[in-house]
């Protein structure tokens, strides 16, 4: 079992029950999935960029990526419907907990001038999004072998009904929020 999942079951559930007064442990919010997305607008001109970005995302997450395609044509961006414009990975179960553990304890401290993640990027329904400016914060990526520094979006989807519940869940899981 992943270290963070074990910690969730033993420490986080009782803490959330006492804080929010849940009557049943099944009412406690749980993480459903983590979606890691890389939008690559420059992939329109050069398709090889997409391959290298997909390889990096596979190394970071340990799971096969899905290539995202344009939903509609946009003439100003020289974009046609069906063109590959990014890649994404959806992590669930054990891999989700392992990724979050690595992200919190290894990757986030490697960000320059890191003072904590923003507490304001909840969506109103208990989901949290983080933007990462460079993929080199992950230890799986070797700085010498990358072509270009790319960012990514990380969305943490929870079963929480409110932002306060989701914030408490992530805080107990170890996400360092800015005060």
Swiss-Prot record:
Alphabetical list of HAMAP family matching this protein: Ribosomal_uL5_B (MF_01333_B)
Pfam families assigned to the protein according to its UniProt record, in alphabetical order: Ribosomal_L5 (PF00281), Ribosomal_L5_C (PF00673)
PANTHER family noted in UniProt: 60S RIBOSOMAL PROTEIN L11-RELATED (PTHR11994)
Keywords: Ribonucleoprotein, Ribosomal protein, RNA-binding, rRNA-binding, tRNA-binding
Gene: rplE
The species this protein was found in: Syntrophus aciditrophicus (strain SB)
Stated family: Belongs to the universal ribosomal protein uL5 family.
Protein's recorded name: Large ribosomal subunit protein uL5
A GO molecular function held by the record: tRNA binding
General function of this protein: This is one of the proteins that bind and probably mediate the attachment of the 5S RNA into the large ribosomal subunit, where it forms part of the central protuberance. In the 70S ribosome it contacts protein S13 of the 30S subunit (bridge B1b), connecting the 2 subunits; this bridge is implicated in subunit movement. Contacts the P site tRNA; the 5S rRNA and some of its associated proteins might help stabilize positioning of ribosome-bound tRNAs.
GO biological processes: translation
Subunit composition and interactions: Part of the 50S ribosomal subunit; part of the 5S rRNA/L5/L18/L25 subcomplex. Contacts the 5S rRNA and the P site tRNA. Forms a bridge to the 30S subunit in the 70S ribosome.
CC terms in the record's Gene Ontology section: ribonucleoprotein complex; ribosome
